[in-house]
Amino acid sequence: MFAYIRGRLEYKNNDFLIVESNGVGYRIFTSLSTISGIGEIGQEVKVYTYLYVREDVISLYGFLTQEELNVFELLISVSGVGPKAAVSVLSAISPSRFSLAVITDDVKTLTKAQGIGKKIAQRIILELKDKIKKEQLTEYAQSEEGGKVLDTDSSKMAEAVSALMVLGYSPAEANKAVSAVYREDMDIETIIKNALKGLARP
């Protein structure tokens, strides 16, 4: 219903914002990361929103970035994960860190979020891993570097490059870093860790 709301920030606490737009005050539930980055009371803000409707509950959720909103929508698509749990995840880890945790089966990182136990974390990974990998691999395949690797190399290499792209590296940067460390006998986590070490060097 609402893609985003732009207006004056009237109030914020650790759970929600109130944004006034055209004389209407919208209560928008959000994450701690959005709360900390949204700005000061009285400033004009833009919040990407999602209208959550279930039986007798209608709530508006919103985030500072489209990336946060995308992860929120992915999370609430998981069986047993509601909007409050999704917000809890986004309060604990960034969207890129979340995507990397899912791709690399990192249950420990997901359970840092309040209310997310091991079983729920495993379910999140099970239900979202292919979706996130497909999104990143599609972007990668459309790049010149991706076309070369996906035609000739293993899926492990492509997945490692995909994980680096989740962290914000370009296809060219990710491909170069992975190619420099890749060996067929490595697992995904080792490839990613070694590639990140290479990227961290000046």
From Swiss-Prot:
Keyword annotations: Cytoplasm, DNA damage, DNA recombination, DNA repair, DNA-binding
Localization: Cytoplasm
Region feature Domain III, mapped onto this chain: 152-202
Listed InterPro entries: DNA_helicase_Holl-junc_RuvA_I (IPR013849), Hlx-hairpin-Hlx_DNA-bd_motif (IPR003583), NA-bd_OB-fold (IPR012340), RuvA (IPR000085), RuvA_2-like (IPR010994), RuvA_C (IPR011114), RuvA_C_sf (IPR036267)
UniProt-annotated stretches for the region Flexible linker: 144-152
GO biological process, one term: DNA repair
Pfam families according to UniProt: HHH_5 (PF14520), RuvA_C (PF07499), RuvA_N (PF01330)
Region annotation (Domain II) ranges: 65-143
Family membership: Belongs to the RuvA family.
Record's comment describing the protein's domains: Has three domains with a flexible linker between the domains II and III and assumes an 'L' shape. Domain III is highly mobile and contacts RuvB.
Described function: The RuvA-RuvB-RuvC complex processes Holliday junction (HJ) DNA during genetic recombination and DNA repair, while the RuvA-RuvB complex plays an important role in the rescue of blocked DNA replication forks via replication fork reversal (RFR). RuvA specifically binds to HJ cruciform DNA, conferring on it an open structure. The RuvB hexamer acts as an ATP-dependent pump, pulling dsDNA into and through the RuvAB complex. HJ branch migration allows RuvC to scan DNA until it finds its consensus sequence, where it cleaves and resolves the cruciform DNA.
The protein, known as: Holliday junction branch migration complex subunit RuvA
Organism of derivation: Acetivibrio thermocellus (strain ATCC 27405 / DSM 1237 / JCM 9322 / NBRC 103400 / NCIMB 10682 / NRRL B-4536 / VPI 7372) (Clostridium thermocellum)
Gene: ruvA
